[in-house]
């Protein structure tokens, strides 16, 4: 039997040899930043403080220490030449299922939906698979932070802010409970006739009024629970109600999924009655209630810029021009890749389409960086390039919103990220096959 010392020697040899053979196939998790780094001569797009030409960014221990022009570089700092390159904040997907959804057709690889209508105690981060293939492809597209979001029911649970680098969900989680998610009922659902799998007729779904009343009752019960605890009363612990306290205390927003104008209007009325902060997610008809959204300073997370029109009479470019129209109307908004981890890596193209259809590029960049960070409560750490924030950024050949630009390197909290992903691996693998074949036949 192999003794312990021999086993350790084998493990050490494997640790040295295996990465050499697999690093092209598997993205490697890198250790925390170990030395100060200065990138000089790049064009730095801070998002909040303009563009710095021929600038320098210095970071240490995962934090930006200084940013500007002609900075003094401390002794011992590793200097990187950024001449001709651009530096942008890491992109942020405000609505994703990255890490909790892998293959749509394989149920056991999806951990998005919980049973029941009210699950505010559910947090996405505890279910995150840090080895998800979608993490690498998302980072290659420039997305370095994502809000992984549970679904199902009326109250789905908490979105978790994830930094897309780490060995485990604990290492990746920036904010475990960043926002509560509510799926606003649809007043005009499609009705289907048929029979259930057991041969009996399907039960009719609850009416719109019944669902809204159920939601209001749950919030009333949770508020009473919070008030009873605050008054020092002895109450039986309920994890669902306990999770709601941060909402009533104004510490986190409620993200309300609503697309239709009637849905959005009713959701806004409800939020005003509850005196809670909300963000509309979806917002397909947001432009039709723009005045009310502006009046109450309610932002929107658009979930699909690259979408077909939802109604026969709408123009083909209705979704494409929505960001530009909301911007003109004064509505604050972010752009997301849309539901599903598969779509997080198309986030820059969603914003790029908005630019092609009238949205100023600087506003599109804000929609996938600082706006998303502000709406979801992490703007003190990410979303722009400023001293004191995390060193989470991209080094590119041009704007990340343009498909012709290359993202040459990413840093997450100062870590120099392995840029390999599964799509690049298969591209290189089968290009090698083609080249080998050509050498044989030529």
What are these model-derived regions, one by one?
Residues 18-24:
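Sec/Tat signal peptide C-region and signal peptidase I cleavage site
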Residues 29-31, 35, 44, 48-88:
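Histidine-rich, glycine-flanked metal-binding segment
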Residues 42, 57, 62, 84, ...:
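Divalent metal-coordination and catalytic microenvironments
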Residues 42-45, 386-430:
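C-terminal cap of metal-dependent C-N hydrolases
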Residues 134, 139-278, 406, 412, ...:
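Polyanionic/metal-chelating signatures
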């Amino acid at each position: 039997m192999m003794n312990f010392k021999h086993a350790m020697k084998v493990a050490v040899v494997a640790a040295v040899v295996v990465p050499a053979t697999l690093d092209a196939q598997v993205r490697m998790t890198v250790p925390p930043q170990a030395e100060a780094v200065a990138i000089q001569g790049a064009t730095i797009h801070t998002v909040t403080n303009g563009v710095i030409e021929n600038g320098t960014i210095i970071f240490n221990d995962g934090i930006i220490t200084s940013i500007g022009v002609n900075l003094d570089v401390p002794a011992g700092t590793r200097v990187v030449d950024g001449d001709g390159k651009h530096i942008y904040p890491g992109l942020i997907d405000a609505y994703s299922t990255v890490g909790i959804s892998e293959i749509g057709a394989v149920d056991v690889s999806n951990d998005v939906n919980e049973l029941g209508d009210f699950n505010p105690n559910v947090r996405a981060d505890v279910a995150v698979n840090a080895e998800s293939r979608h993490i690498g492809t998302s980072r290659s597209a420039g997305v370095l932070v994502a809000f992984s979001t549970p679904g199902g029911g009326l109250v789905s649970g908490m979105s978790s802010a994830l930094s897309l680098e780490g060995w485990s969900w604990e290492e990746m989680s920036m904010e475990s409970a960043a926002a509560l998610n509510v799926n606003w009922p649809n007043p005009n659902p499609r009705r289907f006739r048929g029979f259930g799998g057991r041969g009996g007729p399907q039960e009719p779904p609850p009416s719109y009024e019944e669902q809204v009343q159920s939601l209001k009752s749950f919030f009333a019960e949770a508020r009473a629970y919070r008030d009873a605890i605050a008054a020092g009363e002895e109450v039986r612990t309920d994890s669902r109600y306990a999770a709601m306290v941060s909402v009533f205390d104004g510490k986190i927003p409620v993200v309300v999924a609503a697309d239709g104008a009637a849905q959005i209007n009713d959701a806004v009325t409800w939020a005003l009655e509850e005196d809670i902060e909300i963000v509309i997610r979806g917002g397909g008809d947001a432009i039709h209630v723009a005045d009310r959204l502006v009046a109450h300073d309610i932002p929107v997370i658009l979930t699909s810029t690259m979408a077909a029109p939802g109604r026969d009479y709408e123009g083909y470019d209705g979704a494409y021009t929505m960001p530009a129209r909301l911007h003109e109307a004064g509505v604050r908004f972010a752009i997301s890749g849309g539901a599903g981890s598969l779509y997080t890596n198309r986030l820059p193209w969603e914003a790029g389409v908005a630019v092609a259809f009238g949205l100023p590029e600087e506003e599109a960049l804000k929609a996938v960086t600082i706006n998303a960070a502000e709406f979801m409560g992490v703007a003190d750490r990410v979303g722009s390039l400023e001293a004191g924030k995390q060193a989470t950024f991209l080094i590119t050949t041009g704007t990340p919103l343009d498909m012709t630009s290359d993202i040459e390197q990413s840093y997450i909290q100062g870590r120099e990220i392995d840029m390999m992903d599964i799509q690049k691996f298969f591209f290189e693998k089968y290009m090698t096959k083609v080249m080998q074949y050509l050498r044989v036949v030529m």
